[in-house]
C-alpha cells in the first residue's frame, strides 16, 4: 500500500470513528433530555391505572445515578405513596413483654445538662419511635430546678426526641404545655398542648408543625388531656380531655381531629363516673382507652370510641385484680365491670391495660399504696368476667424497693400485626427524696413478645447522693 492509500485509509477510518462518536453523543443527549423531562409514573395499587407522581406526597426522594461514557444521568424514581394509618391488622399474640429502651436521664443529669421532666410517654410514626415529656423549663443542675414538684407553670413545654435519646439542651420544644398528647396519622404529627391559667386554660392543636385549631376551658377547672399518645384512624385522630374536679364530678369530652382541625366533640357516656389521663390504643375500626378514676374507683374505666359515628360508651375493667394506686389488697379488691368499686378511689395514678380476647393484660405498681415497683401480668377472663382474679405470666419490671410513677401504652405496627408496648415513668427527687429540691424522671420501655424472656428489674438507678441538690 502506497503512502497516499495509507493516508486515505487512515482518514476514512478516522471519519467513521468520528461519525460513530458523534452519533453516540447525540444518543446520550437525547437519552438525558428524555429522562429529565419524562414524567415519572407510578402504578396505583387501587385501580392499576398510571398516575403522575407530582400530586403525591413524597416520603423519600430516591435518586439513582447511572454512569454512561463519563456522562452522569440522574433518574428520579417514584416515591412511596404516604397514606393515613388505619391500624387494621390484628393484635399480636404475646406471651409477655421484653425490654426495649431505657434513657437513664437522671443518672446522666449527675454530670450533664439534662432537662427536668415529668409525664413522659412514647409514640411512633410509621418508621420510628419518639419519647415525649413535659419539661420544667430548666435543666436539673440549675437553680430553676428548685420546687419543680409543681405540675402547672407557664414555662413547661412538650419535649420530643428519638426514643432512647435523653432530653439534652438540643432537644426540640414542640409547644407550650403542662398537659399533652401526641400521635401520627401516617402523614404528620398532631400535638395537643394544654397551657394557661387553671381556671381558663387553652388547648392548642398543632399539626405538621403549624397551629391549626384551639379550644378553651369548658369547666374552668384545669383542662387536661391524656399524657400519652392519641390515636388516628384513616385521617381522624381522637383524644380524651377532661375539665373539672379531680376528686368529684368532671366534664370529660372526646375530641375528633382531622389534620389539626376539630371536627366533632362527643360527651362521655356510659357508666364511668370519673375519667382522666387515658391510655388509648387502636382497636380497628375504633379506639379503646383505659383511664384513671380519681374519684370513686381503683378499678380502671374503659372508654370505647366509635370513629365512624362519634358515639361513646364507657365501663370498667372486669378484673378483680385492679390496676390503680392506691387500692385494696388483691384478696379484698373487686370489680363488677360496670361501676367504680368505691375502694380507695380518691387519688390515683395513670396506667394502662388492653384486652386480649376474654383476658386482659395490665400493668400496675407493686405497692398497693405508693408509686413503688412495677409489675405486669395477664388476668384470665379479666375482660369479660366480673371480679376475675386468675393471674398468669407475671413479670417484675421495677422491684418494689424502687420508685415508679405514671405508665401508659403505645402501639407499633409490624408486618403482620399490631404490637402493644408500654413505658414506666421512674420518678426521682421530691416529695420522697428530700435531700434534693427537684423532681424529675427517667423512663423504661417494654414491648410485647411472642418469644421467651427472663427476669430482672430496671429501676432509675441514680444514686441520689451523687446528684445536684
UniProtKB/Swiss-Prot annotation:
The chain crosses the membrane at residues 10-30. Its main location: virion. GO terms for cellular component: host cell plasma membrane; membrane; virion membrane. Residues 323-344 are annotated as: Disordered. InterPro entries: Glyco_hydro_34 (IPR001860), Sialidase_Influenza_A/B (IPR033654), Sialidase_sf (IPR036278). Residues 31-469 are virion surface. Disulfide bonds join 92-417, 124-129, 183-230, 232-237, 278-291, 280-289, 318-337, 421-447. It holds the Pfam family Neur. The keyword RNA-binding does not apply. Ca(2+) binds at residues 293, 297, 324. It is a single-pass type II membrane protein. Glycans are attached at residues 61, 69-70, 86, 146, 200, 234, 402. Residues 334-343 have a biased composition (Polar residues). The keyword Metal-binding applies. Homotetramer. The influenza A genome consist of 8 RNA segments. Genetic variation of hemagglutinin and/or neuraminidase genes results in the emergence of new influenza strains. The mechanism of variation can be the result of point mutations or the result of genetic reassortment between segments of two different strains. Belongs to the glycosyl hydrolase 34 family. This is Neuraminidase.
Amino acid at each position: 500500500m502506497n503512502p497516499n492509500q495509507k493516508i486515505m485509509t487512515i482518514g476514512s477510518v478516522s471519519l467513521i470513528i468520528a461519525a460513530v462518536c458523534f452519533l453516540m453523543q447525540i444518543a446520550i443527549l437525547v437519552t438525558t433530555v428524555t429522562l429529565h423531562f419524562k414524567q415519572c409514573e407510578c402504578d396505583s395499587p387501587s385501580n392499576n391505572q398510571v398516575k403522575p407522581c407530582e400530586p403525591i406526597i413524597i416520603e423519600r426522594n430516591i435518586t439513582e445515578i447511572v454512569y454512561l461514557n463519563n456522562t452522569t444521568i440522574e433518574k428520579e424514581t417514584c416515591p412511596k405513596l404516604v397514606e393515613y394509618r388505619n391500624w387494621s391488622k390484628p393484635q399480636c399474640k404475646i406471651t409477655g413483654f421484653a425490654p426495649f429502651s431505657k434513657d437513664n436521664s437522671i443518672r446522666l443529669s449527675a454530670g450533664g445538662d439534662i432537662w427536668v421532666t415529668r409525664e413522659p410517654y412514647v409514640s411512633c410514626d410509621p418508621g420510628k419511635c419518639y419519647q415525649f415529656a413535659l419539661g420544667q423549663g430548666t435543666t436539673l443542675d440549675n437553680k430553676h430546678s428548685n420546687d419543680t414538684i409543681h405540675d402547672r407553670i407557664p414555662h413547661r413545654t412538650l419535649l420530643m426526641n428519638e426514643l432512647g435519646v435523653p432530653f439534652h439542651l438540643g432537644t426540640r420544644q414542640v409547644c407550650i404545655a403542662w398537659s399533652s398528647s401526641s400521635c401520627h396519622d401516617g402523614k404528620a404529627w398532631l400535638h395537643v398542648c394544654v397551657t394557661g391559667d387553671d381556671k381558663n386554660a387553652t388547648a392548642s392543636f398543632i399539626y405538621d408543625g403549624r397551629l391549626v385549631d384551639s379550644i378553651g376551658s369548658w369547666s374552668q377547672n384545669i383542662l387536661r388531656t391524656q399524657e400519652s399518645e392519641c390515636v388516628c384512624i384513616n385521617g381522624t385522630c381522637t383524644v380524651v380531655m377532661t375539665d373539672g374536679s379531680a376528686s368529684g364530678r368532671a366534664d370529660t369530652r372526646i375530641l375528633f381531629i382531622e389534620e389539626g382541625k376539630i371536627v366533632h366533640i362527643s360527651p362521655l357516656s356510659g357508666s364511668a363516673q370519673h375519667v382522666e389521663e387515658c391510655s388509648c390504643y387502636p382497636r380497628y375500626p375504633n379506639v379503646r382507652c383505659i383511664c384513671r378514676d380519681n374519684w370513686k374507683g381503683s378499678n380502671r374505666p374503659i372508654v370505647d370510641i366509635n370513629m365512624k359515628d362519634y358515639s361513646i360508651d364507657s365501663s370498667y375493667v372486669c378484673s378483680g385484680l385492679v390496676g390503680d394506686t392506691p387500692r385494696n389488697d388483691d384478696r379484698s379488691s373487686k370489680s363488677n365491670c360496670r361501676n367504680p368499686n368505691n375502694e380507695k378511689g380518691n387519688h390515683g395514678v395513670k396506667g394502662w391495660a388492653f384486652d386480649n380476647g376474654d383476658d386482659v393484660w395490665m400493668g400496675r405498681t407493686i405497692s398497693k399504696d405508693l408509686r413503688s415497683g412495677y409489675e405486669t401480668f395477664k388476668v384470665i377472663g379479666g375482660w369479660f368476667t366480673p371480679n376475675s382474679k386468675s393471674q398468669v405470666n407475671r413479670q417484675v419490671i421495677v422491684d418494689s424497693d424502687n420508685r415508679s410513677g405514671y405508665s401508659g401504652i403505645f402501639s407499633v405496627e409490624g408486618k403482620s400485626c399490631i404490637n402493644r408496648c408500654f413505658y414506666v415513668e421512674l420518678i426521682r427527687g421530691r416529695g420522697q427524696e428530700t435531700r434534693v429540691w427537684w423532681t424529675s424522671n427517667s423512663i423504661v420501655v417494654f414491648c410485647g413478645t411472642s418469644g421467651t424472656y427472663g427476669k430482672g428489674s430496671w429501676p432509675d438507678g441514680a444514686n441520689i447522693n451523687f446528684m445536684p441538690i
